[in-house]
């Protein structure tokens, strides 16, 4: 996996991201274009008009993120609109068409702290577009995340100890003036606590499309289920746990229409709840949860199988909140292609504390 470290102004951060991951960004754009055009019933002209609306809203409401996106486009030698499309792919893919995928996410308090993790499942073709991105910004926590090249917010954690996960949901609708989910992920990754992340996202006045974001640290965690017309907060159960897959667990009201989540979303959720009932609280046992193949290939550790499972687990990430580290297994976690650990230096942690003062 390509590792990219960026620092400086938003434009400088974006330019370095774009130039370092130029090839991966080109492939990510090709994939996103094919996904959107292959599924939607809208015309090319309608899609281009919607993209212009999303870009204009982003430029007006979140200029710092838009500046970074412009920097990515310059570094990657692409059109700004193409990078905007990458960062609003969820809104196109799940707000306009019936795209479906699977991910499993858990937060768990333990006798010695808290653990958090995710299997990120998607089309196998996107695996080669994944990068490890580190972002250093003045006055904000340093971020380390796994993202698709060109996307400014995804799955990761920061030097303040805040970790963020992301699952697809399938509620119909797109509100161009709302907050895109990848920008919400970036906001969470720039926060010094889950509570701050929640307040930041809620204060934006609503989301553009549907998704689920989990934000946790050593002390607390929240899940945010949202659609273009609703945002619901999931809290930990009596055992200090949050489990989520790809269907709604909370009541979004009669106007929020959920569109045929993958049937295995329920089976994966139930299976993880069952596994956690016997969980002993150790880091080793928590890492093992993600290798489970019950109901293969539609399992927690998902596998591609023609005609049955169109995607696979592309990476697993486990956050150790006490140790302030994240272990990443690229590929299916029971047979990873690569394993590495993300940590922060004392200087990063000190800067994060100062940002919180």
Swiss-Prot record:
Name where it mostly resides: other
Looking at the UniProt entry, the stretches that span the membrane are: none
Catalyzes what? Answer: isopenicillin N + phenylacetyl-CoA + H2O = penicillin G + L-2-aminoadipate + CoA + H(+)
Q: Which GO terms describe its molecular function?
A: isopenicillin-N N-acyltransferase activity
Q: So where does 6-aminopenicillanate get bound?
A: 121, 310
**What keywords is this UniProt entry annotated with?**
Acyltransferase, Antibiotic biosynthesis, Peroxisome, Transferase, Zymogen
List the GO cellular component terms: peroxisomal matrix
Record-linked PANTHER family: BETA-ALANYL-DOPAMINE_CARCININE HYDROLASE (PTHR34180:SF1), PEPTIDASE C45 (PTHR34180)
Looking up Gene3D superfamilies in the UniProt record yields: 1.10.10.2120, Penicillin V Acylase, Chain A
Principal EC category: transferase
Taxon lineage: Eukaryota, Fungi, Dikarya, Ascomycota, Pezizomycotina
Q: Which Pfam families match?
A: AAT
The listed locations are: Peroxisome matrix
What is the protein name given in its UniProt record? Acyl-coenzyme A:6-aminopenicillanic-acid-acyltransferase 40 kDa form
Query: What species is given as this protein's source?
Result: Emericella nidulans (strain FGSC A4 / ATCC 38163 / CBS 112.46 / NRRL 194 / M139)
């Amino acid at each position: 996996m390509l590792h990219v470290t960026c620092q400086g102004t938003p434009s400088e951060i974006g330019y370095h991201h774009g130039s370092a991951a130029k090839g991966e960004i080109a492939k990510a754009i090709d994939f996103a274009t094919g996904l959107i055009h292959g599924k939607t019933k809208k015309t090319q002209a309608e899609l281009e008009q919607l993209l212009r609306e999303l870009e204009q809203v982003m430029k007006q409401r979140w200029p710092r993120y838009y500046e970074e996106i412009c920097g990515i486009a310059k570094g990657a030698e692409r059109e700004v609109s193409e990078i905007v499309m990458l960062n609003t792919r969820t809104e196109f893919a799940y707000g306009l068409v019936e795209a479906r995928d699977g991910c499993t996410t858990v937060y768990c308090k333990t006798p010695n702290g808290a653990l958090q993790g995710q299997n990120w499942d998607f089309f196998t073709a996107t695996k080669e577009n994944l990068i490890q991105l580190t972002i250093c910004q003045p006055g904000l926590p340093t971020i380390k995340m796994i993202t698709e090249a060109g996307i400014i917010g995804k799955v990761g954690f920061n030097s303040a100890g805040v970790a963020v996960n992301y699952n697809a949901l399938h509620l119909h609708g797109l509100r161009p003036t709302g907050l895109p989910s990848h920008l919400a992920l970036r906001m969470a990754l720039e926060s010094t606590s889950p509570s701050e992340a929640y307040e930041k996202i809620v204060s934006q006045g609503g989301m553009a499309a549907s998704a689920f974001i989990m934000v946790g640290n050593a002390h607390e965690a929240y899940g945010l289920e949202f659609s273009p017309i609703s945002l619901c907060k999931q809290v930990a159960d009596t055992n200090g746990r949050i489990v989520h897959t790809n269907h709604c667990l909370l009541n979004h009201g009669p106007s929020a229409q959920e569109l045929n989540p993958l049937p295995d979303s329920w089976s994966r959720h139930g299976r993880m709840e069952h596994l956690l009932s016997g969980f002993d609280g150790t880091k080793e046992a928590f890492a093992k949860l993600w290798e489970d193949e019950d109901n293969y290939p539609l399992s927690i550790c998902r596998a591609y199988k023609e005609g049955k499972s169109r995607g696979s687990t592309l990476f697993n990430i486990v956050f150790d909140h006490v140790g302030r580290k994240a272990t990443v297994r690229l590929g299916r976690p029971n047979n990873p292609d690569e394993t590495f650990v993300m940590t922060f230096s004392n200087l990063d942690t000190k800067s994060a504390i100062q940002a919180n003062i």
